[in-house]
């Protein structure tokens, strides 16, 4: 179905500084985002275009053409001034791929077969559905340490658009999941999502990438303190940078992390077919280990490390499914790949809100899951600890050091993603809080998520030591 969003735009609108330079980025973003939200997540295309994309790239949508082909599972975004069109297409098991200077046939020629999750074995009593997190069943929850009515009221507020008026965007909250003492005690969905909807984590994907590095280290396939296995760095000033330094965002190889227009990170995500090559080609600016600089490219360098160790797109996919996802009963999660069959480890992870909570619970349980040590205690202790370069960042996740962001909770750790994605771990209260959505206004994100955390905390008492 082809829709002409608009046929004209005045010269005044096009005269903004740098606006024309942003058109290719905007088209790539829109094609990729619309493809992922329609075909990965099942959202309505008009909802995605009008409520999620337009706020991100306005006023550019007024000159664009958008074609969503449900039969081919493909999205094409063009403009009325040029013949250049951005195309993204869906593949079962690995989501949407943005085509830039490659064809769909090129991408589909890279060997890939999606796997099926393992069969659920019945319990001794014949039951086939275990209680969450080891299955999907849930029960009514009451606990003396929690005022459930107060907790529900606090969590419901982040779905209420009228509670946060005066900001530059809507909340667009898609999910909230709350876990207490390993039990799922609250979940609510919005924007057409439900408990089965794979939801984009954006930079929460970095935490998954960190876990995969930890798994490789646990299995003796990777040494964190040796030079990162990136052949492009041999015989250069970057050759001594270690995987541990990359995990801590302290490799010293920098890119501009700005999502508001044309920048290094938007070029990598929306104008480069080979994202790993772009990420590893950037120059060294600081001495490795000394300087913290948050970067999606750093996580993509880690994804390149994973790919170099394992060898292929299929091997990477099989590894994260079989070694991390399936053991946690994450049955339908995936991370998207670029047009060269390389995992986009900094931004493109999809899973249900319940599954994002499972990842948080894995770290809160020190890597233990249903009697199995999925990640070593040594790895978890390292990942959750401040680095030498930054006291508020560990191995691909954030740390509320000294209660800087949330007072009185120095043990709080969190995964964080663009547009307000969060998985929050609060060990002192035995809580996991997940929030997903499409909130463009940064100040609105911070206010609403802080209100959610404070409200949930007010409804709970500390866990027993």
Language model regions located:
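Active-site helix/loop module of the DD-peptidase/beta-lactamase fold
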Residues: 218-253, 281, 311-347, 351
């Amino acid at each position: 179905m082809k829709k002409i969003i608009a046929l004209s735009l005045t010269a005044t609108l096009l005269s903004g500084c740098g606006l024309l330079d942003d058109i290719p980025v905007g088209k790539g973003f829109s094609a990729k985002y619309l493809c992922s939200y329609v075909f990965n997540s099942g959202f309505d295309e008009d909802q995605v275009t009008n409520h999620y994309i337009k706020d991100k790239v306005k006023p550019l949508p007024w000159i664009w053409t958008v074609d969503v082909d449900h039969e081919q599972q493909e999205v094409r975004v063009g403009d009325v001034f040029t013949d250049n069109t951005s195309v993204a297409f869906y593949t079962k098991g690995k989501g949407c791929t943005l085509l830039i200077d490659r064809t769909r046939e090129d991408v589909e020629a890279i060997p890939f077969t999606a796997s099926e999750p393992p069969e659920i074995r019945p319990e001794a009593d014949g039951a086939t559905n275990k209680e969450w997190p080891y299955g999907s069943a849930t029960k009514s929850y009451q606990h003396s340490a929690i005022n459930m009515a107060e907790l529900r009221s606090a969590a419901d507020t982040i779905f209420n658009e009228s509670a946060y008026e005066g900001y530059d965007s809507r909340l667009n909250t898609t999910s909230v999941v709350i876990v207490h003492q390993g039990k799922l005690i609250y979940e609510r969905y919005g924007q057409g999502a439900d408990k089965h909807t794979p939801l984009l984590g954006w930079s929460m994907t970095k935490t998954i990438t960190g876990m995969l590095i930890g798994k490789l280290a646990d299995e003796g396939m990777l040494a964190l303190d040796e030079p990162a296995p990136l052949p492009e760095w041999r015989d250069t000033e970057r050759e001594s940078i270690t995987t541990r330094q990359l995990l801590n965002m302290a490799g010293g190889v920098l890119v501009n992390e700005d999502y508001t227009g044309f920048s290094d990170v938007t070029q990598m995500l929306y104008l480069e077919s080979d994202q790993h090559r772009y990420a590893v080609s950037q120059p060294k600016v600081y001495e490795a280990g000394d300087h913290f600089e948050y970067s999606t490219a750093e996580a993509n360098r880690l994804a390149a490390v994973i790919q170099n160790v394992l060898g292929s797109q299929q091997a990477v996919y099989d590894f994260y499914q079989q070694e991390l996802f399936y053991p946690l009963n994450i049955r339908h999660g995936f991370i998207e790949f670029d047009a060269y069959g390389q995992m986009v480890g900094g931004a493109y992870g999809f899973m249900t809100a319940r599954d994002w909570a499972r990842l948080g619970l894995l770290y809160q349980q020190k890597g233990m899951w249903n009697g199995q040590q999925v990640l070593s205690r040594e790895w978890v202790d390292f990942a959750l600890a401040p680095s030498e370069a930054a006291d508020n960042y560990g191995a691909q996740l954030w740390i509320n050091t000294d209660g800087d962001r949330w007072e009185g909770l120095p043990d709080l750790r969190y995964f964080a993603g663009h547009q307000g994605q969060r998985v929050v771990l609060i060990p002192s209260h035995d809580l996991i809080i997940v929030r997903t959505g499409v909130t463009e206004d940064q100040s609105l994100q911070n206010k609403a998520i802080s209100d959610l955390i404070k409200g949930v905390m007010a409804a709970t008492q500390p866990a027993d030591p």
